[in-house]
Amino acid sequence: MQGTVNSERLKFDAEVGKVLKLVIHSLYTNKDIFLRELISNASDACDKLRYQSLSNQDLMDAGSELKIVISVDKDKNRLYISDNGIGMNREDLINNLGTIAHSGTQKFLDAINSGASSQQGVVELIGKFGVGFYSAFMVASEVIVESCKAGESVGYQWKSSGDGEFVISQLESDQVSRGTRITLALKPEECEFVDKFRIEHIVTTYSYHINYPVYFLNDKGEEERLNSEAAIWTKAKDEISAEEHQNFFRTVAHVGGEPWMILHNKNEGVIEYTNLLYIPSIKPFDLFHPDRKCSVKLYVNKVFITEDNVQIIPQYLRFLKGIIDSSDLPLNISRETLQNNKIIEKIKRSLVKRVLSELKKKAESNIEDYTKFWDNFGSVLKEGLCESMNTEFREELISVCRFYSTHSNDSLISLEDYIERMKPEQNNIYYLTGNDLDSIKKSPQLEGFVSRGIEVLLLVDPVDDFWTNVVTDYQKVPLRSVIRADEDLEKFSDVEKDDESKESQNEDAQSKEKVDKFISYAAQVLTNLVSNVRVSKKLTDSPVCLAVADGSMDIRMERFLREQKQLNYKSTKILEINSKHPIVSKMIDQYAENGENAVLCNMLHLLLGQACILEGEELQNVSDFAERMNNVLSQIN
């Protein structure tokens, strides 16, 4: 540290103590950021010199390297940050480091104390004060700034303990170098910040991609570089090699494999930002972990801000990896209060629109490749459909969703594909939810639809039970579960029964009375176990199935809510009976000939149990079910 002359003690505004207290104890929640702020200021100083040297080449020696150097003195518990940027003279030191004493300070405090100002308004007010520099007082009992402005030969020192005043002095030496050197006399409890590895971690985390090299001066007097050569996202698309993408992807994604998709865009509209985002080709193991956080890092002018405190990427796009860098966000204290930032919201909407647009292009151009993405992240993407407030991009989101169906075998289809294949008399998009594709294809619920050539979506992700209760239609075509769509089938001809003779139809009409009586008997036997018993129009091969009335909760959703202790009752379902099934047909004939008996009663209970098992419902009384089964089996001759 150099000697000084002509010292002058100046006072901050009377309220500066309150402001410093707010900055140190309230606005910054992470002490590490003091170094980020000082490095950012040093980078700005280098930027200013580079810009001004374009019009005045004498300010900067040809070929000289603009850089930032960090060094420590462990014995004195001191940390030094130096740059050879534009530097400051006496007037600059007073104005730049004394900005906090401007008349707006009291207004700022009034806004904080009254709570009348919006969070964003307060953030913008903070941006006027150069508060980032003062974050150094979180860790330092004294801050000393020595600086010499480019083109001048006299250097000055600014010194303060953050107690409401500062001292300005002239440096004695006439051999001062251009630039600025900040000395932090660290508090005893902050000795961790003279540790080289701690400093390297902070630089790597927050300042890895700034424009200028950041060096650490080691014990041997050697400068070790701590940051990257350049921010890859600042390059043009065609200047980034596949190897560079692969290396950066591994750095930000922490997953194996190659990126399935790369989204590199520079937005220069109302909001300026650059995004370099990757969609992995491998699903992360913790994709559905409840504590999983966003993996997209937010930068401001290549300075890392956060990846935790801001929802710049919605949860349903959490498979995205990479960075977003904006020059429209303030590079100051606002990084701690970005949650309700209007600029962030605009960037978020723009990104969502871009990502969904690129996914749609891929789905339409290469369904085989898109299927790989869908198998990994389709269930996550559909989470966006569950958000009742997320209506802005709902149509776009559904358009990139793909589904299995009774028509497509094992290939995926879009809802546009489904609508194009709808029958002329069909008014609904039909779907069925289940646990897996193999079992759902065998569901009795599908029989009547398949026999009539009506396509049904097969939804097998847990999230499907949720979004189908939020999204009611697509392109004005209602979505309808086959579990509650029995009555719809009357208007469709059964392709397997079109050759049925009028004689057979007359016989059916004559047997209707027997069927009705049996249905009434079944409803009486199963009183309190089901809400209704009716003849099914959807069953062709199975004897029975469960159904729910319109307006009732889906069976799987109700079961999920019960399991999560969010529902404390179990509703009674409708039992649908296939009167044409051989077993049921014999039961109808027996009842018509002999009336009620114990065997028929047991068989009705067993059929209800079968229907429950097929829908994944628990039997009310397993022992009773087994006893009835044994009684019926004992009747076999």
UniProtKB/Swiss-Prot annotation:
Cytoplasm found in the keyword field: yes
Pfam families: HATPase_c_3, HSP90
SUPFAM superfamilies: ATPase domain of HSP90 chaperone/DNA topoisomerase II/histidine kinase, HSP90 C-terminal domain, Ribosomal protein S5 domain 2-like
Organism: Ehrlichia ruminantium (strain Welgevonden)
Compartment annotation: Cytoplasm
C: annotated span: 560-637
Keywords linked to the UniProt accession: ATP-binding, Chaperone, Cytoplasm, Nucleotide-binding, Stress response
MF terms (GO), sorted A to Z: ATP binding; ATP hydrolysis activity; ATP-dependent protein folding chaperone; unfolded protein binding
Subunit structure: Homodimer.
Location of region: B: 336-559
Described purpose of this protein according to its UniProt entry: Molecular chaperone. Has ATPase activity.
Protein name (record): Chaperone protein HtpG
A cellular component term, taken from the record's GO annotations: cytoplasm
Protein family (similarity comment): Belongs to the heat shock protein 90 family.
Region (A): 1-335
Keyword ATP-binding applies: yes
CDD domains: HATPase_Hsp90-like
